[in-house]
Design a protein with these regions (language model features):
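Residue-level recognition of alpha-helix termini/interfacial anchor residues
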Residues: 137, 144-145, 233, 244, ...
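Non-transmembrane alpha-helical segments in soluble domains
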Residues: 138-143, 238-239, 256, 273-276
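C-terminal "capping" alpha-helix adjacent to the active site of nucleotide-linked donor transferases
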Residues: 228-247
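A short, well-ordered alpha-helix in the C-terminal region of glycosyltransferases
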Residues: 247-261
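C-terminal alpha-helical cap of glycosyltransferases
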Residues: 265-282
Length: 282
């Protein structure tokens, strides 16, 4: 029970009375807003972001509470803070007391896998594929390090006539590599969940944003191989760990253990309910 309470307090750091904003909604109003979005999108043919998975993930938990309860929320990739406590999918790790994390858009962000490939037979290389235009960090990374011999990195979208453009690579192919870069995009690195559930090791700078996965609790060189923000030491660190496979296996085991806490769906639902219950208690 202590581990559950610890996670609830991590996601929801509010411990004093607060005022809702004028935009706060009941669950019925949340539903009505979503229907308006869908009408604009499909009937009026307007370019409105549906955020359907966000809506269902919040609506399903919100529905357990009295109809008069209200909350503030913001869907999407959130990297800023709020003047009043607000339900979000992601937040900055530092100074984000008013950002209350819920497990939103889980279908995209919580993809754990069973890796059939033993670490010892994987390639002594580092892989990354992804969308680069949503992150200056990713653009810098691939433009400056695409030609490192032990890296197979590149953007698969958008398509560009540049040497760092590479074809899409499915997860099953990426799992053939011992080292997998997890580079933050619009907010967090989406691939971090499946990488940390695999028999490969996550390589990344210290994360700046977090989600329900609690990226802020990950320990460098314990749960992942830590590299500098400018990636300048990535090649040296990977070469070091290629020569020290037992150290890598320990990191992978720690990462797998961290992932295990998210696999009990009944427990995850309970934590979600308790996060909102704490929100409404103030």
């Amino acid at each position: 029970m202590q581990s559950i309470r610890s996670r609830v307090d991590y996601y929801n750091k509010i411990n004093e009375h607060f005022q809702l904003s004028e935009n706060a909604v009941t669950n019925d109003e949340l539903f009505f807003r979503q229907m308006l979005k869908l009408k604009k999108r499909y009937v009026n043919k307007k370019p409105v972001k549906k955020r359907t998975t966000y809506f269902f993930d919040l609506f399903n938990v919100f529905s357990f509470f009295p109809k008069h309860k209200k909350l503030d929320y913001k869907f999407g990739d959130i990297t800023h803070t709020f003047p009043s406590p607000t339900i979000v999918k992601s937040r900055p790790i530092v100074n984000s007391k008013n950002s209350i994390i819920m497990g939103l858009n889980k279908v995209r962000h919580f993809n754990f896998i069973e890796d059939p490939i033993n670490f010892s037979v994987k390639k002594d290389m580092a892989i990354w594929r992804g969308y680069a235009k949503n992150s200056k960090n990713r653009e810098y990374f691939i433009k400056n390090y695409y030609d490192v011999p032990i890296f197979d990195i590149g953007q698969h979208a958008p398509k560009v006539n540049k040497p760092w453009h590479k074809p899409f690579m499915p997860i099953s192919e990426q799992l053939r590599f011992k080292f997998i870069f997890c580079i933050e995009g619009a907010d967090t690195a989406t691939n971090i969940k499946w990488v940390m559930s695999s028999n490969s090791v996550c390589v990344m700078p210290e994360p700046k944003y977090e989600t329900w996965f609690m990226e802020g609790k990950l320990k460098p060189d314990f749960h992942y191989i830590s590299i500098k923000d400018d990636f300048s030491d990535a090649e040296d660190k990977i070469n070091f760990f290629i020569k020290h496979p037992n150290d890598v296996k320990k990191i992978i085991a720690n990462a797998n253990d961290f992932v295990n806490q998210f696999k009990d769906q009944r427990r995850e639902k309970l934590i979600s309910l308790l996060v909102l219950d704490k929100y409404f208690s103030y």
